[in-house]
Amino acid sequence: MSDRFEATYLIETPHDVASVAQELAGEQSTATSSRMPGETDALIRDFGARVEHIEALPPAEAPSLPVAHTLGQRVHRARLTLSWPLHNIGDSLPMLLTTLLGNQTGMRRLSGIRLERVAMPQSFIAAQPRPAFGIAGTRRLTGVQGRPLIGSIVKPNIGLAPEQTAAMARQLAEGGVDFIKDDELLANPPYSPVARRAALVLRALDEAAQRTGRRTMYAVNITDGLDEMRRHHDAVVQAGGTCIMVNLNSVGLSALLALRRHSQLPIHGHRAGWAMMTRCPALGMEFQPYQMLHRLAGVDHLHVSGLGGKFWEHADSVLQAAHECLTPLDTQAGAADDRALPVFSGGSTIFDVAPTYQGIGTADLIFASGGGIFGHPDGLAAGCASLRQAWEAAIAGQELRAYAQSRPELAAALARGKPVRKA
């Protein structure tokens, strides 16, 4: 596959699958609704998409989406693999995305199309910027080795003045948190501009570091227009920051690529809006292509949701997403480590630690918790300590309650019990 790239789709149609597959391949390469004079056999051979494989699946009971359909007609499902010559897109990530999920998603004869996996030639992968810091760089900047980074977020997530955000960040840092991030809804509002918030928070973290001996990493949300993001980034650097954050789906691949070229700091990628792209099983994409696109563009940390949290995604899907982040893209000998640090968040507590570790088998992650820290009966420091202790137990293979017998912070968190999830 050195000169071609492949994509695998789940498709659904009331029409002949083989015919629809050929139409889909044509739509995303050389074909129009009818063959044009310039569409020669040679052009199709050199630039056309190919149907590589069709796997028939059990039929659907009814079309998942509106489609030209005769009542009672069988609705076919299939797994379809297409390939394209790499010279169709060159080294362009935006054009890769256009090819993978373009006009074919609106084809009238499809009642469902979902991108499942993408395989790219190593030459394409090597041409992309990919993470500048990744796992090793983040650990170096935080000084955390051998365990996950314990993270949190300042609450309330919006509405605080920079001085209030800084005061809360200082409490978290003095309590032992390794990583603090802005909420995805807080970027550069008039009541808390990036430059002032970053300056005050980072000064507070420096003061906390004088007491703790460790400087907490703060991911400053700089989501904005590209020119503004560059200016925000520079303000964070000037203030002594060690991380920036962007809402990936809001800024797009091109802005992320440009920011990666400009940035001197790790890029923390928030996937706000991801559910819109994946929650419908007949549309959108799986996480494998999503994380590949953003890691190729240079993101260092990537959210994957959490186990037992407040969001819809089930545990197996969350763990698979983390595995994808931790799977190298460039597998050539001597290639730089392009893995991204998966970020578990969204209601994570001590009760999610052991299944998280058992599910991914590594401590290379950020484990972000709000209620698990703020809600501890003995305060922030005890909440942070209880999470570290839960991870110590998981890594050592010890049962949580047994490990808590000599650790009052963990014991108190256990006594509080699991949070009650709303139905």
Swiss-Prot record:
Disulfide bonds: none
Residues the record lists as binding Mg(2+): 181, 183-184
Pfam families: RuBisCO_large (PF00016), RuBisCO_large_N (PF02788)
Cofactor entry: Mg(2+)
Signal peptide span: none
Example GO biological process: carbon fixation
Annotated SUPFAM superfamilies: RuBisCo, C-terminal domain, RuBisCO, large subunit, small (N-terminal) domain
Function: May be involved in sulfur metabolism and oxidative stress response. Does not show RuBisCO activity.
Family named by the database record: Belongs to the RuBisCO large chain family. Type IV subfamily.
Protein name: Uncharacterized ribulose bisphosphate carboxylase-like protein
